[in-house]
């Protein structure tokens, strides 16, 4: 299958990265290399470090960026390890970092990856195929309480308790091995009247929650955003595209925390901490896709871009 992934908010990312000749940039999720290609065109004799934990994505990215030669360094790893991986390359500071969070169009559309409730496939959902834990493991081994917690926490699915109960009941008869088997259980758990009137697919929220749990996406994001800010040179920028409220909240909260000056307790009348703001937030409100982009790519509809600049 052809690796298709249309870069979202491409112009907005390139503009806000403030790319300069000869500097070092990082694409934490190279995917189909749409963003990386535009960055590489603008760095002159600089360097671009491209991360991805998905072997398929890296193969495609290497082909699509081949013309840029040794300007590009590829790293097969989860971007939560950005600080250590760059250190191993002898790089302690960089000038811009891009994160495009979440699952790629290729991963959704490739049946064998098991991300989609629209294609029947083995229940997988691993972004990194070397990850020992798949969606099948979670669905068939987590307790009812743990399943309910995962589904509600990561998707705000109000039928989480009932879905967890139905999953546990179904797997007593036989394991739930495929995406369509899981969809069938979810649809039985949600009352028909509700399903008939709700927007979107009945399984969408549960699949999102399980995918986040499989890949520990929110833990990874929290670690990576904090470390990325540490890695930036003064005037370096971090651009983060998120696709749901949990991701966006993590980024917003970390940006606000790192923008703070004094962190003394309120009862202390005079600052003694000497804490200085580390960043300034460039996007007071997140940038969202234009009407024109949404007409061309409906998968961009929930995207939000937040940008911050290192000041010390």
Swiss-Prot record:
It comes from the Bacteria. One of its GO terms (biological process) is rRNA base methylation. One of its GO terms (cellular component) is cytoplasm. It catalyses: cytidine(1402) in 16S rRNA + S-adenosyl-L-methionine = N(4)-methylcytidine(1402) in 16S rRNA + S-adenosyl-L-homocysteine + H(+). GO terms for molecular function: rRNA (cytosine-N4-)-methyltransferase activity. Keywords: Cytoplasm, Methyltransferase, rRNA processing, S-adenosyl-L-methionine, Transferase. InterPro entries: RsmH, SAM-dep_MeTrfase_MraW_recog, SAM-dependent_MTases_sf. Its EC number is 2.1.1.199. Specifically methylates the N4 position of cytidine in position 1402 (C1402) of 16S rRNA. This is Ribosomal RNA small subunit methyltransferase H. It comes from Finegoldia magna (strain ATCC 29328 / DSM 20472 / WAL 2508). The gene is rsmH.
């Amino acid at each position: 299958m052809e690796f298709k992934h249309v870069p979202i908010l491409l112009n907005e990312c390139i503009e806000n990265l403030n790319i300069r000749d000869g500097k070092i940039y990082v694409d934490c999720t190279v995917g189909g290399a749409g963003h990386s290609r535009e960055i590489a065109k603008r760095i002159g004799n600089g360097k671009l470090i491209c991360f991805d934990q998905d072997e398929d994505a890296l193969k495609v990215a290497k082909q699509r960026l081949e013309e840029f030669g040794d300007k590009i360094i590829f790293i097969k790893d989860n971007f939560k390890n950005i600080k250590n991986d760059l250190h191993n390359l002898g790089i302690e500071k960089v000038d811009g970092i891009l994160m495009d969070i979440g699952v790629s169009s290729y991963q959704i559309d490739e049946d064998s990856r098991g991300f989609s409730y629209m294609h029947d496939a083995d229940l997988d959902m691993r972004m990194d195929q070397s990850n020992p834990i798949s969606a099948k493991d979670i669905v068939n081994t987590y307790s009812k309480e743990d399943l309910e917690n995962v589904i509600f926490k990561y998707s705000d699915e109000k039928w989480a308790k009932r879905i967890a109960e139905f999953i546990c009941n179904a797997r007593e008869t036989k394991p739930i091995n495929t995406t369509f088997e899981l969809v069938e259980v979810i649809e039985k758990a949600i009352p028909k009247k509700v399903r008939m009137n709700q927007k979107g697919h009945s399984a969408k929220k549960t699949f999102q929650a399980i995918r986040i749990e499989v890949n520990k996406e929110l833990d990874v994001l929290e670690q990576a955003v904090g470390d990325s800010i540490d890695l930036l040179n003064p005037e370096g920028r971090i651009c983060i595209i998120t696709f749901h409220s949990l991701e966006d909240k993590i980024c917003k909260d970390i940006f606000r925390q790192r923008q703070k000056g004094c962190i003394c307790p309120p009862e202390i009348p005079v600052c003694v901490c000497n804490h200085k703001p580390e960043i300034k937030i460039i996007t007071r409100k997140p940038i969202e896709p234009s009407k024109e982009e949404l007409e061309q790519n409906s998968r961009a509809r929930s995207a939000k871009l937040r940008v911050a600049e290192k000041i010390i």
